[in-house]
Amino acid sequence: MTHEIRAIFDRIAPVYDQLNDWLSLGQHRIWKEMAIKWSNPQPGETFLDLCCGSGDITLGLARRVGATGHVYGVDFSANLLAMAQERSQRKYPYQSTITWVEADVLDLPFDSNQFAGATMGYGLRNVKDIPHSLQELYRVLKPNAKAAILDFHRPENAQLRSFQQWYLDNVVVPIATQLGVKEEYAYISPSLDRFPMGKEQVELAYEVGFASATHYPIANGMMGVLVVSK
């Protein structure tokens, strides 16, 4: 399954940002900013951005930790990491403060208690073992560190859930089809059906040891941010 998902993200890399704009009605950058804010980066700190994709959140974190801090952007798609690196060279002057790492979030190549905070944008839904992924995140965070995990969410409201499904079927998949990546985006709906709801995410976070966990529904419950503290 991991190899299949890695292959999907390698294939969609060229149209990833364009599709994210359509997927989110142009709002994903606002939601990513919310996740950054909740993770509370401070100047000089070392931060981690998991499933960094094309680097939006990584760059946002880098701007906040500044020239004296450091951010590690981690993804298992080599194509997306190459895109992220290219974008960062155009948009961010302090290249030495960002390290791009090709790695699996289920087996992070970092020491325990290494990071002052972390983010994950649209990644938790795609890992094959969510509790283990949260355990790895817990391991690499310093005591009292915060992390914010942004992802799609099935709304509890039946009408909003119907709208979300209609939008995925009638807007997202046709656009993906036009861009030649229909199969790659058709998986979003089944992945959402498997994904734990907000309160279940909170329970999983407590089970792996986090001291506090809160799930914030955003975009009428069609997105959510899980905020945890070690």
Report the location of each language-model feature:
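A short SAM/SAH-binding and catalytic strip from SAM-dependent methyltransferases
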Residues: 116-130
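A short glycine-rich, Lys/Arg-flanked "PGG" loop and its adjoining helix->strand segment in the class I
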Residues: 131-146
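Conserved alpha-helix/loop element of class I SAM-dependent methyltransferases that forms part
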Residues: 25-45, 60
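Core SAM-dependent methyltransferase catalytic element
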Residues: 202, 209-230
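C-terminal alpha-helical "lid/dimerization" subdomain adjacent to the S-adenosyl-L-methionine
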Residues: 3-4, 150-206, 214
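Class I SAM-dependent methyltransferase SAM/SAH-binding core
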Residues: 46-107
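N-terminal, positively charged/glycine-rich alpha-helical extensions of SAM-dependent methyltransferases
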Residues: 1-17, 167-168
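A short acidic, Gly/Pro-enriched loop at the edge of an enzyme's catalytic core
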Residues: 45, 106-118
